[in-house]
């Protein structure tokens, strides 16, 4: 069982900065803005060759005007405390001891969890003076760190992991045993290298988790959908746009298949974005789309397909990600409104006709289970291995049905096709003058390959490669007769 470490504290004390340092990532959004982190963010860390799970949480504090959101954030933090084996109580050395710190310490004493007091932001300060007040919390030794620079982090984590590291028995080996052990270790390293090299070529998509990004405009029900699938209060859900600010990665096993769900912040028009933090959130969402295998676009049934939904779809298509479209809150609209929404989808999403559309209620769960079949179908299609002979045969059938257009009076020749990559699926076609083929014929070939290969939910890209002329850079060697004829011609021209 991998030990779990939870980072707890007031808002803006540096929990997310510390989380990023421990996980050696930039997964947690960081800014000088209280209440930026709202959901539980999970990450993997390796400390002294031992694996741990780190949980970043929203701050615990009473802020006037946002009590309801704050209540949900506090609940998320308390859930993290219950999950954790060790709690790191992060404090702000510059701000000193505040009433909220006393309340958190009181709660931690009741839970009787292994707790470490960590005073952050001690850079540029006298650590002895800065840490004195925090001993009054009666939770043991206070560790001073600077998470942004890494000062004191190694000493802290060495103390944290001590209970989880088994003591190694002292074994004295003879010289012969030492030599045998050395060569066995060398052989293991060689075998490991060979294995890693072969793994690059033998990696089976079925053995990898499906990374699923859930995207959409603010307040369309993305976090509600994640919570229903997980069957727990995992994501902060509230009827205010922008409740989710960061991209949260959540592992899940469903029907013996591994998934990694990525719950993202809502994306709206750039003109409506006022806060710098929201711009960071949008960038993280777009990066989550690029990192995903499949994207689940959530549309609000009450509002229909907006221009912002179309912009998101365009970005997903350009990124080459597989797609499943979900219309949420379907139970909240009338039958007449449902007809209008379906007509709008047919009219405005005609360019994404390869993606399946589901009508669901994330709140009540209707239609949610059917999503997994379409998600797996889209992933399987985008990672399908297709041999060269089949692709070439399909290309020839497409050519027989509809000949390529003329280019400067000459017919384009399509010679053969092969696979050029997966996720997205790329078909490379070789031939003469292929780079001059117009867009309409490219779309025809793309749709023909899609129908023939039964590709659903995944885009197909067609790339053309011009066949090289083997004689393009070579000069013909003249025969003896041609050489004599050339000399006579030159002599004749000189006499004139």
From Swiss-Prot:
Q: Which UniProt keywords apply?
A: GTP-binding, Nucleotide-binding, Repeat, Ribosome biogenesis
User: Where, by residue number, does GTP 2 bind?
Assistant: 216-223, 263-267, 328-331
Q: Where does GTP 1 bind?
A: 9-16, 56-60, 120-123
| Every EngA-type G domain range | 3-168, 210-383
Task: Give residue ranges for domain KH-like.
Answer: 384-468
Under SUPFAM superfamilies, the record lists:
P-loop containing nucleoside triphosphate hydrolases
Q: Which GO terms describe its biological process?
A: ribosome biogenesis
Tell me, what is one Gene Ontology molecular-function annotation carried by this entry? Answer: GTP binding
Q: Which Pfam families match?
A: KH_dom-like, MMR_HSR1
Q: Which InterPro entries match?
A: G_ENGA, GTP-bd, GTPase_Der, KH_dom-like, KH_dom-like_a/b, P-loop_NTPase, Small_GTP-bd
Q: Return the PANTHER family for the record.
A: GTPASE DER
**Its biological purpose:** GTPase that plays an essential role in the late steps of ribosome biogenesis.
Complex and partners:
Associates with the 50S ribosomal subunit.
Instruction: Tell me its family.
Output: Belongs to the TRAFAC class TrmE-Era-EngA-EngB-Septin-like GTPase superfamily. EngA (Der) GTPase family.
Q: What name does this protein carry?
A: GTPase Der
Q: Which gene encodes it?
A: der
